[in-house]
């Protein structure tokens, strides 16, 4: 059976039309419903409330503040984060526990918000449409029938929930993230700082962060580019950004006290 999202996407392709914002929002809503039903989403009201408020504080500063944004914490120790079209952003517990300071978490949120603002997943669909790529390839591009499930990717290990972005997509999301977290008053240096932290983690705990590196191509040149964007950022001149806060560490402690994550599902497992 074709997943409803795949059917909807294929209709858009066959119709030869670009994806409108309303269609994007509907695709995201349907995909999020599938993901939320199968991933271990954290329902603790304090955790859920904090991540929603934090994410919204950044999303409200973007050019797509009109979207109905939703932010979630996934109960898995894998270090990763991802976004779905239409304003759905997910951060794994493992990334929150790895972050040393607030600005590293806000940097992550800003980056993922950047993918939505730039409509990267939607552009992949439109590219598939324009080049007349078949439904099977469209499925792999949009990741809505990953691992042969014929439905939204729901890999608890955190290695593949969504289409892997190109290096250009990642650079655009970095730029968008730097601008928008700074507009929200958070230190944009948290973005390259997190990248450096993850590179260090890969040396000592490679399996913990492998999902991040699979989904987010990362090299030293990208870190240097983020540093340069921050140096040239007008908003950074003379501003005192928020680097850390007691509220973040209370949130992090609350996350650490959550029940243990469920058994990890191996990559590619149904």
List each model region and its residues.
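C-terminal capping/extension segments of zinc metalloprotease domains
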Residues: 1, 17-30, 61-80, 165-270
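Sec-dependent bacterial lipoprotein signal peptides
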Residues: 1-15
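Post-signal peptide N-terminal segment of mature Sec-exported envelope proteins
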Residues: 23-61
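Juxtacatalytic substrate-recognition/specificity segment
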Residues: 36-40, 63-97
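Acidic/histidine metal-binding catalytic segments
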Residues: 47, 67, 126-131, 149-153, ...
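Short pre-active-site segment immediately N-terminal to the catalytic Zn-binding motif
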Residues: 90-107, 122-125, 163
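Catalytic Zn2+-binding segment of zinc metalloproteases
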Residues: 103-104, 113-129, 141-142
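Membrane-active amphipathic alpha-helices enriched in small hydrophobic residues
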Residues: 129-145, 149-161
């Amino acid at each position: 059976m074709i997943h409803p999202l795949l059917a909807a996407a294929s209709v858009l392709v066959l119709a030869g039309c670009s994806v409108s914002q309303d269609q994007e929002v509907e695709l995201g809503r349907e995909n999020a419903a599938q993901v939320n039903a199968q991933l271990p989403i954290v329902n603790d009201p304090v955790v859920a409330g904090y991540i929603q408020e934090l994410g919204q504080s950044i999303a409200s500063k973007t050019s797509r503040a009109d979207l109905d944004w939703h932010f979630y914490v996934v109960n898995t120790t894998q270090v990763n984060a991802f976004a779905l079209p239409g304003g759905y952003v997910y951060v794994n517990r493992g990334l929150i526990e790895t972050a040393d300071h607030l600005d590293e978490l806000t940097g992550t949120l800003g980056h993922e918000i950047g993918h939505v603002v730039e409509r990267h997943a939607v552009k992949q669909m439109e590219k598939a449409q324009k080049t007349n790529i078949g439904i099977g390839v469209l499925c792999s591009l949009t990741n809505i029938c990953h691992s042969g499930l014929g439905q939204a990717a729901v890999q608890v290990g955190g290695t593949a929930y969504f289409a892997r972005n190109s290096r250009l997509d990642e650079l655009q999301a970095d730029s968008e993230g730097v601008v928008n977290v700074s507009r929200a008053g958070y230190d944009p240096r948290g973005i390259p700082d997190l990248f450096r932290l993850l590179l260090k983690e890969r040396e000592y705990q490679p399996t913990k962060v492998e999902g991040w590196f699979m989904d987010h191509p990362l090299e030293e040149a990208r870190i240097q580019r983020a540093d340069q964007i921050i140096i040239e950022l007008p908003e950074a001149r003379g501003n005192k950004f928020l680097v850390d806060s007691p509220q973040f560490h209370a949130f992090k402690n609350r996350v650490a006290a959550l029940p243990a994550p469920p058994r990890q599902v191996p990559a590619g497992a149904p």
